[in-house]
UniProtKB/Swiss-Prot annotation:
EC numbers: 2.7.7.6
Gene: rpoA
NCBIfam families associated with the record: PRK05182.1-2, PRK05182.2-5, rpoA
Organism: Methylobacterium sp. (strain 4-46)
Protein name as it appears in the record: DNA-directed RNA polymerase subunit alpha
Gene Ontology MF, one: DNA-directed RNA polymerase activity
GO cellular component: cytoplasm; DNA-directed RNA polymerase complex
Alphabetical list of HAMAP family matching this protein: RNApol_bact_RpoA
Ranges where the record places region Alpha N-terminal domain (alpha-NTD): 1-235
Keyword rRNA-binding in record: no
Quaternary state and interactors: Homodimer. The RNAP catalytic core consists of 2 alpha, 1 beta, 1 beta' and 1 omega subunit. When a sigma factor is associated with the core the holoenzyme is formed, which can initiate transcription.
A GO BP entry: DNA-templated transcription
Family to which the UniProt record says this protein belongs: Belongs to the RNA polymerase alpha chain family.
Length: 339
């Protein structure tokens, strides 16, 4: 149908490359190409805004410091005033596996630095920047603090973090929940066949370590996908009935299943895609050595794939006579119910 050409005939990106940064758990550059002219800016801007505003994270929302009534106080034996201490507390990076508010405590005696690593946490909370300096204590000085940690998204100012029944001395803190700290993107020209008028989108994502850059990008894309679904106000025409199945295949029909249906991690799936491994039949003919030569493909991804294949009774390095078959896409559709 003519209507379907609106989306079916557009160029779709078929290459996604993840380049780890100086700290792979926090920084990565993701390159997607080719894109229709203008789509690089459209997608890059949308992904950037969602990455910075809409991902869930954890942050300190309030603090109570023994002997302190308000944030404009000073503490005997502590070189920083309370305002500076609160500013430092705002930058504590936290990973929390619970949606419920949690408490953390800190108690330390001088002299010396007080760091985020001195905070006592419970099992499902982790401090990601333990070297962060909160304040400095003189000889004989002591400081005790109790923090409230909550989960949310985006930026929430301190006045919205003050409970209605807040006790005297509770200091609300500006909360930056987003695990993404910085996002930038650039658009370059790229080639699609003989056509040089296509976009290449390069995005650099930095996080606080609570989530990997590539996973953060995947979550942002899913958010956009879900938000746009309501605008699709039509059903696509049903495809014609499939032709009768062939009586026999010379290999397991499961080999016709696409690897992107295996529910692999984002990194493993991207590595297979960049190596043009589309079907399970393509994958199992690869040896372990060949897989490890794939860019950005490590031992962790290898073990993950081996486990998934083993659950299907398959393994790497298999010999599959008759692979790949002719009309593989048609065969995959016809035998879909068999796997």
């Amino acid at each position: 149908m003519v209507i379907q050409k609106n989306w079916q005939e557009l160029i779709k990106p078929n290459k996604l490359e993840v380049v780890p940064g100086h700290d792979p758990k926090r920084v990565a550059t993701v390159v997607a190409e080719p894109l229709e002219r203008g789509f690089g800016t459209t997608l890059g801007n949308a992904l950037r805004r969602v990455l910075l505003s809409s991902l869930q994270g954890a942050a300190v929302t309030s603090v109570h410091i023994d002997g302190v009534l308000h944030e404009f106080s000073s503490i005997p034996g502590v070189r920083e005033d309370v305002t500076d201490i609160v500013l430092n507390i705002k930058t504590i990076a936290i990973r929390s596996n619970s949606d419920a508010p949690k408490r953390m405590t800190l108690r330390k005696t001088g002299p010396g630095l007080v760091t985020a690593g001195d905070i006592s946490t419970i099992g499902d909370i982790q401090i990601l920047n333990p070297d962060l300096v909160l304040c400095t204590l003189d000889e004989g000085a002591e400081i005790r603090m109790e923090f409230t940690v909550a989960t949310g998204k985006g930026y929430v100012p301190a006045d919205r973090n003050r409970p209605e029944d807040a006790p005297i001395g509770l200091i609300p803190v500006d909360a930056l929940f987003s695990p993404v700290t910085k996002v930038s993107y650039r658009i370059e020209n790229t080639r699609e066949g003989q056509d040089l008028d296509k976009d290449k989108l390069t995005m650099t994502v930095e996080t606080n370590g609570a989530v990997s850059p590539e996973d953060a990008l995947a979550y942002a894309a899913r958010i956009i996908q879900d938000q746009l679904q309501i605008f699709v106000n039509f059903e696509e025409p049903r495809k014609e009935e499939a032709a009768p199945l062939a009586p026999q295949l010379p290999f397991n029909p499961a080999l016709l299943k696409k690897v992107d249906e295996l529910e692999l991690s984002v990194r493993s799936a991207n590595c297979l895609k960049n190596d043009n491994i589309v079907y399970i039949g393509d994958l199992i003919q690869k040896t372990e050595a060949e897989m490890l030569r794939t860019p950005n493909f490590g031992r962790k991804s290898l073990n993950e794939i081996k486990e998934v294949l083993a659950a299907m009774g398959l393994h790497l390095g298999m010999d599959v006579p008759g692979w790949p078959p002719e009309n593989i896409e048609d065969l995959a559709k016809r035998f879909e119910e068999h796997y």
